[in-house]
Amino acid sequence: MIYNRCGKSGLKLSAISLGFWKNFGHNGVFSNMEDMVHTAFDLGITHFDLANNYGNPYNGSAEENFGRILDRGMREFRDELCISTKAGYEMWDGPYGDRNGSRKYLTASLDQSLKRMKLDYVDIFYHHVFDPNTPLEETALALDNAVRQGKALYVGVSNYNARQTEEISAIFKELKTPFVVNQPSYSMMNRWIEEDGLDRWAEENGVGISVFSPLYQGLLTDKYLGGIPEDSRVGRGDTWLGGQLDDDFRKKLNALNDVAHERGQKLSQMALSWVLHNSAVTTVLIGASRPSQIVENTESIRRIDFTDEEIARIENILQNKH
Protein backbone atom coordinates (compact mmCIF):
# COMPACT_ATOMS: atom_id res chain seq x y z
CA MET A 1 0.00 0.00 0.00
CA ILE A 2 1.04 3.59 -0.62
CA TYR A 3 0.50 6.12 2.17
CA ASN A 4 0.23 9.79 1.20
CA ARG A 5 0.55 12.77 3.50
CA CYS A 6 -2.77 14.59 3.75
CA GLY A 7 -1.87 18.04 2.50
CA LYS A 8 0.85 19.56 4.66
CA SER A 9 -0.37 17.84 7.82
CA GLY A 10 1.38 14.98 9.58
CA LEU A 11 -1.54 12.64 8.86
CA LYS A 12 -0.98 9.92 6.26
CA LEU A 13 -3.85 8.22 4.45
CA SER A 14 -3.73 5.00 2.46
CA ALA A 15 -3.96 5.77 -1.26
CA ILE A 16 -6.99 3.47 -1.38
CA SER A 17 -9.62 3.99 1.32
CA LEU A 18 -12.80 2.05 1.99
CA GLY A 19 -16.06 4.00 1.84
CA PHE A 20 -19.22 2.88 3.64
CA TRP A 21 -21.82 4.74 1.57
CA LYS A 22 -23.27 1.57 0.05
CA ASN A 23 -23.49 -2.06 1.21
CA PHE A 24 -22.91 -1.52 4.93
CA GLY A 25 -26.48 -0.91 6.10
CA HIS A 26 -28.70 -3.35 7.95
CA ASN A 27 -30.19 -4.60 4.67
CA GLY A 28 -26.82 -6.18 3.84
CA VAL A 29 -25.18 -9.39 5.03
CA PHE A 30 -23.09 -8.63 8.12
CA SER A 31 -20.57 -11.42 7.56
CA ASN A 32 -19.84 -9.97 4.10
CA MET A 33 -19.34 -6.49 5.55
CA GLU A 34 -16.94 -7.89 8.12
CA ASP A 35 -15.03 -9.81 5.45
CA MET A 36 -14.70 -6.63 3.37
CA VAL A 37 -13.29 -4.62 6.27
CA HIS A 38 -10.86 -7.40 7.20
CA THR A 39 -9.77 -7.78 3.57
CA ALA A 40 -9.18 -4.04 3.27
CA PHE A 41 -7.14 -3.90 6.48
CA ASP A 42 -5.07 -6.93 5.47
CA LEU A 43 -4.24 -5.14 2.19
CA GLY A 44 -2.96 -2.09 4.06
CA ILE A 45 -6.09 0.05 3.78
CA THR A 46 -6.16 1.98 7.03
CA HIS A 47 -8.66 4.74 6.23
CA PHE A 48 -12.35 3.93 6.68
CA ASP A 49 -14.81 6.64 5.64
CA LEU A 50 -18.33 6.89 7.03
CA ALA A 51 -21.10 9.46 7.52
CA ASN A 52 -24.04 9.85 9.84
CA ASN A 53 -26.55 9.22 7.03
CA TYR A 54 -24.91 6.15 5.48
CA GLY A 55 -26.81 2.89 5.55
CA ASN A 56 -30.18 1.40 4.71
CA PRO A 57 -32.94 0.93 5.69
CA TYR A 58 -32.21 3.85 8.02
CA ASN A 59 -29.55 6.50 8.51
CA GLY A 60 -26.75 5.53 10.85
CA SER A 61 -26.87 1.80 10.26
CA ALA A 62 -23.48 1.80 8.51
CA GLU A 63 -21.87 3.32 11.60
CA GLU A 64 -23.66 0.79 13.79
CA ASN A 65 -22.35 -2.10 11.73
CA PHE A 66 -18.84 -0.67 11.73
CA GLY A 67 -19.05 -0.48 15.52
CA ARG A 68 -20.03 -4.16 15.59
CA ILE A 69 -17.09 -5.04 13.34
CA LEU A 70 -14.73 -3.15 15.65
CA ASP A 71 -16.18 -5.06 18.61
CA ARG A 72 -15.48 -8.39 16.94
CA GLY A 73 -11.70 -8.23 17.05
CA MET A 74 -10.71 -4.96 15.35
CA ARG A 75 -11.01 -2.51 18.22
CA GLU A 76 -7.56 -3.56 19.43
CA PHE A 77 -6.19 -2.08 16.19
CA ARG A 78 -7.77 1.35 16.78
CA ASP A 79 -4.42 3.14 16.71
CA GLU A 80 -3.70 1.60 13.29
CA LEU A 81 -6.94 2.96 11.82
CA CYS A 82 -7.97 6.36 10.52
CA ILE A 83 -11.74 6.62 10.95
CA SER A 84 -13.66 9.52 9.47
CA THR A 85 -17.31 10.48 9.60
CA LYS A 86 -19.40 13.34 8.29
CA ALA A 87 -22.54 15.33 9.05
CA GLY A 88 -24.48 17.80 6.95
CA TYR A 89 -27.37 16.09 5.17
CA GLU A 90 -30.83 15.47 6.62
CA MET A 91 -30.54 13.01 9.49
CA TRP A 92 -33.51 13.14 11.88
CA ASP A 93 -36.96 14.73 12.14
CA GLY A 94 -37.53 18.31 13.14
CA PRO A 95 -35.72 21.59 12.43
CA TYR A 96 -32.44 20.56 14.05
CA GLY A 97 -31.81 17.41 12.04
CA ASP A 98 -32.34 18.69 8.51
CA ARG A 99 -29.60 19.52 5.99
CA ASN A 100 -27.53 22.21 7.66
CA GLY A 101 -24.22 23.25 9.14
CA SER A 102 -25.34 24.66 12.47
CA ARG A 103 -23.41 24.16 15.66
CA LYS A 104 -26.38 22.40 17.25
CA TYR A 105 -26.74 19.88 14.42
CA LEU A 106 -23.03 19.14 13.98
CA THR A 107 -22.42 18.74 17.72
CA ALA A 108 -25.40 16.42 18.23
CA SER A 109 -24.59 14.42 15.11
CA LEU A 110 -20.98 13.75 16.10
CA ASP A 111 -22.09 12.61 19.55
CA GLN A 112 -24.55 10.21 17.91
CA SER A 113 -21.88 8.89 15.51
CA LEU A 114 -19.43 8.24 18.34
CA LYS A 115 -22.14 6.38 20.25
CA ARG A 116 -23.04 4.22 17.24
CA MET A 117 -19.41 3.27 16.62
CA LYS A 118 -18.56 3.11 20.35
CA LEU A 119 -15.61 5.45 19.88
CA ASP A 120 -14.14 8.19 22.04
CA TYR A 121 -13.09 10.15 18.98
CA VAL A 122 -12.88 10.06 15.19
CA ASP A 123 -9.73 10.94 13.31
CA ILE A 124 -11.47 13.24 10.82
CA PHE A 125 -14.85 14.96 11.21
CA TYR A 126 -16.26 16.52 8.04
CA HIS A 127 -19.00 18.97 7.29
CA HIS A 128 -20.67 16.92 4.55
CA VAL A 129 -22.15 19.61 2.31
CA PHE A 130 -21.97 23.40 2.10
CA ASP A 131 -24.88 25.14 3.82
CA PRO A 132 -25.68 28.59 2.37
CA ASN A 133 -28.07 29.34 5.24
CA THR A 134 -25.58 29.02 8.09
CA PRO A 135 -22.67 31.44 8.55
CA LEU A 136 -19.38 29.74 7.73
CA GLU A 137 -18.03 31.05 11.03
CA GLU A 138 -20.62 28.98 12.90
CA THR A 139 -19.85 25.81 10.94
CA ALA A 140 -16.11 26.32 11.40
CA LEU A 141 -16.50 26.93 15.13
CA ALA A 142 -18.55 23.74 15.49
CA LEU A 143 -15.82 21.69 13.80
CA ASP A 144 -13.12 23.46 15.79
CA ASN A 145 -15.01 22.75 19.00
CA ALA A 146 -15.10 19.03 18.16
CA VAL A 147 -11.30 19.05 18.08
CA ARG A 148 -10.96 21.05 21.29
CA GLN A 149 -13.32 18.63 23.06
CA GLY A 150 -11.20 15.68 21.94
CA LYS A 151 -13.96 14.21 19.79
CA ALA A 152 -12.01 14.64 16.54
CA LEU A 153 -8.32 14.96 15.72
CA TYR A 154 -8.71 16.75 12.37
CA VAL A 155 -11.52 18.38 10.41
CA GLY A 156 -12.50 18.46 6.77
CA VAL A 157 -15.22 19.57 4.39
CA SER A 158 -16.99 17.71 1.61
CA ASN A 159 -18.79 18.96 -1.49
CA TYR A 160 -17.31 22.45 -1.06
CA ASN A 161 -16.04 24.20 -4.19
CA ALA A 162 -12.76 26.12 -4.34
CA ARG A 163 -14.22 29.47 -3.24
CA GLN A 164 -16.14 27.95 -0.34
CA THR A 165 -13.10 25.95 0.74
CA GLU A 166 -10.89 29.02 0.62
CA GLU A 167 -13.35 30.99 2.74
CA ILE A 168 -13.71 28.41 5.50
CA SER A 169 -9.97 27.70 5.39
CA ALA A 170 -9.28 31.33 6.28
CA ILE A 171 -11.48 30.96 9.37
CA PHE A 172 -9.76 27.73 10.35
CA LYS A 173 -6.39 29.47 10.10
CA GLU A 174 -7.52 32.14 12.54
CA LEU A 175 -8.82 29.48 14.92
CA LYS A 176 -5.72 27.29 14.39
CA THR A 177 -8.03 24.37 13.59
CA PRO A 178 -6.32 21.33 11.99
CA PHE A 179 -8.19 21.53 8.67
CA VAL A 180 -6.56 18.90 6.48
CA VAL A 181 -8.88 17.65 3.73
CA ASN A 182 -11.70 18.29 1.27
CA GLN A 183 -13.75 15.34 -0.02
CA PRO A 184 -15.16 16.00 -3.52
CA SER A 185 -16.42 13.72 -6.27
CA TYR A 186 -13.92 13.27 -9.10
CA SER A 187 -13.43 10.81 -11.94
CA MET A 188 -12.63 10.60 -15.64
CA MET A 189 -16.27 11.44 -16.32
CA ASN A 190 -16.64 14.08 -13.62
CA ARG A 191 -13.81 16.59 -13.62
CA TRP A 192 -15.42 19.56 -11.94
CA ILE A 193 -12.57 20.00 -9.44
CA GLU A 194 -10.22 20.70 -12.36
CA GLU A 195 -12.61 23.19 -13.94
CA ASP A 196 -13.33 24.84 -10.59
CA GLY A 197 -9.66 24.88 -9.61
CA LEU A 198 -10.26 23.07 -6.31
CA ASP A 199 -7.49 20.54 -6.91
CA ARG A 200 -4.89 23.21 -7.65
CA TRP A 201 -6.03 25.38 -4.73
CA ALA A 202 -5.82 22.43 -2.35
CA GLU A 203 -2.34 21.47 -3.50
CA GLU A 204 -1.06 25.04 -3.26
CA ASN A 205 -2.55 25.54 0.21
CA GLY A 206 -1.59 22.25 1.81
CA VAL A 207 -5.05 20.67 1.96
CA GLY A 208 -5.53 17.02 1.04
CA ILE A 209 -8.11 15.70 -1.43
CA SER A 210 -10.06 12.53 -0.59
CA VAL A 211 -12.02 11.57 -3.71
CA PHE A 212 -15.41 9.88 -3.67
CA SER A 213 -17.10 8.25 -6.69
CA PRO A 214 -13.80 7.72 -8.58
CA LEU A 215 -15.56 5.04 -10.65
CA TYR A 216 -18.46 7.38 -11.46
CA GLN A 217 -21.01 5.43 -9.42
CA GLY A 218 -19.60 2.17 -10.76
CA LEU A 219 -20.05 3.06 -14.44
CA LEU A 220 -16.28 3.07 -15.08
CA THR A 221 -16.09 -0.72 -14.96
CA ASP A 222 -16.23 -3.51 -17.52
CA LYS A 223 -19.72 -4.39 -16.26
CA TYR A 224 -21.38 -2.01 -18.73
CA LEU A 225 -19.26 -2.52 -21.84
CA GLY A 226 -21.98 -4.50 -23.59
CA GLY A 227 -25.10 -3.07 -22.00
CA ILE A 228 -26.88 -2.95 -18.65
CA PRO A 229 -26.95 -6.21 -16.65
CA GLU A 230 -30.13 -6.73 -14.66
CA ASP A 231 -28.19 -7.36 -11.44
CA SER A 232 -26.14 -4.14 -11.74
CA ARG A 233 -26.71 -0.89 -9.85
CA VAL A 234 -28.05 0.70 -13.03
CA GLY A 235 -30.24 -2.32 -13.71
CA ARG A 236 -31.71 -2.04 -10.21
CA GLY A 237 -32.12 1.73 -10.52
CA ASP A 238 -29.67 2.24 -7.66
CA THR A 239 -27.86 5.21 -9.24
CA TRP A 240 -29.01 8.49 -10.75
CA LEU A 241 -26.38 8.21 -13.50
CA GLY A 242 -28.03 5.32 -15.36
CA GLY A 243 -29.54 7.64 -17.95
CA GLN A 244 -26.05 8.47 -19.22
CA LEU A 245 -25.39 4.93 -20.42
CA ASP A 246 -26.21 5.63 -24.05
CA ASP A 247 -24.35 4.37 -27.13
CA ASP A 248 -21.85 7.25 -27.04
CA PHE A 249 -21.02 6.59 -23.39
CA ARG A 250 -20.52 2.88 -24.04
CA LYS A 251 -18.21 3.68 -26.96
CA LYS A 252 -16.09 5.73 -24.57
CA LEU A 253 -16.08 2.90 -22.04
CA ASN A 254 -14.94 0.39 -24.65
CA ALA A 255 -12.22 2.71 -25.96
CA LEU A 256 -10.99 3.34 -22.40
CA ASN A 257 -11.11 -0.39 -21.76
CA ASP A 258 -8.76 -0.92 -24.72
CA VAL A 259 -6.24 1.49 -23.17
CA ALA A 260 -6.57 -0.24 -19.80
CA HIS A 261 -6.05 -3.67 -21.40
CA GLU A 262 -2.84 -2.46 -23.07
CA ARG A 263 -1.64 -1.24 -19.66
CA GLY A 264 -2.35 -4.64 -18.13
CA GLN A 265 -5.25 -3.30 -16.09
CA LYS A 266 -9.00 -3.61 -15.88
CA LEU A 267 -11.01 -0.48 -16.69
CA SER A 268 -11.87 0.10 -13.03
CA GLN A 269 -8.21 -0.17 -12.04
CA MET A 270 -7.11 2.32 -14.67
CA ALA A 271 -9.87 4.72 -13.64
CA LEU A 272 -8.57 4.67 -10.06
CA SER A 273 -4.96 5.01 -11.22
CA TRP A 274 -5.97 8.01 -13.35
CA VAL A 275 -7.49 9.79 -10.34
CA LEU A 276 -4.42 9.05 -8.19
CA HIS A 277 -2.20 10.36 -10.99
CA ASN A 278 -3.46 13.84 -10.10
CA SER A 279 -0.81 15.04 -7.65
CA ALA A 280 -3.43 16.93 -5.61
CA VAL A 281 -5.24 13.70 -4.70
CA THR A 282 -4.34 12.07 -1.39
CA THR A 283 -6.66 9.06 -1.49
CA VAL A 284 -9.56 7.55 -3.43
CA LEU A 285 -12.57 6.09 -1.66
CA ILE A 286 -13.73 2.81 -3.12
CA GLY A 287 -17.06 1.18 -2.50
CA ALA A 288 -17.46 -2.57 -2.66
CA SER A 289 -20.11 -5.26 -2.47
CA ARG A 290 -17.68 -8.15 -1.93
CA PRO A 291 -14.07 -8.63 -0.80
CA SER A 292 -12.78 -9.58 -4.26
CA GLN A 293 -13.61 -6.07 -5.54
CA ILE A 294 -11.40 -4.57 -2.85
CA VAL A 295 -8.52 -6.86 -3.82
CA GLU A 296 -8.98 -5.98 -7.49
CA ASN A 297 -9.23 -2.23 -6.95
CA THR A 298 -6.25 -2.11 -4.61
CA GLU A 299 -4.11 -3.42 -7.47
CA SER A 300 -4.53 -0.01 -9.13
CA ILE A 301 -1.74 1.46 -7.00
CA ARG A 302 0.78 -0.61 -8.95
CA ARG A 303 0.25 1.49 -12.10
CA ILE A 304 -0.26 5.10 -11.11
CA ASP A 305 2.26 6.12 -13.77
CA PHE A 306 0.96 7.08 -17.23
CA THR A 307 2.93 7.84 -20.38
CA ASP A 308 2.24 11.09 -22.21
CA GLU A 309 0.77 9.02 -25.03
CA GLU A 310 -1.64 7.24 -22.68
CA ILE A 311 -2.78 10.52 -21.15
CA ALA A 312 -3.34 11.97 -24.62
CA ARG A 313 -5.30 8.91 -25.77
CA ILE A 314 -7.51 9.01 -22.69
CA GLU A 315 -8.10 12.73 -23.14
CA ASN A 316 -9.06 12.26 -26.78
CA ILE A 317 -11.51 9.52 -25.83
CA LEU A 318 -13.11 11.67 -23.15
CA GLN A 319 -13.36 14.60 -25.57
CA ASN A 320 -14.90 12.42 -28.32
CA LYS A 321 -11.83 12.82 -30.54
CA HIS A 322 -11.02 9.12 -30.85
Where are these regions (language model features)?
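Hydrophobic faces of well-ordered beta-strands that scaffold small-molecule active sites
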Residues: 14-18, 48-50, 81-85, 125-127, ...
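Structural motif
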Residues: 39, 43, 116-117, 149-150, ...
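Beta/alpha (TIM)-barrel catalytic core signal, keyed to glycine-rich beta->alpha loops juxtaposed to Asp/Glu
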Residues: 134-322
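Alpha-helix N-cap and loop-to-helix initiation/capping positions
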Residues: 28-35, 58-61, 65, 97-105, ...
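N-terminal binding-site loop/beta-alpha segment at the start of enzyme catalytic domains
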Residues: 1-81
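N-terminal small/glycine-rich loop or linker at the start of catalytic domains
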Residues: 7-25, 84-98, 121, 126
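Short, acidic/polar
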Residues: 28-40, 101-117, 165-169
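Active-site groove signature of glycoside hydrolases
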Residues: 114-134
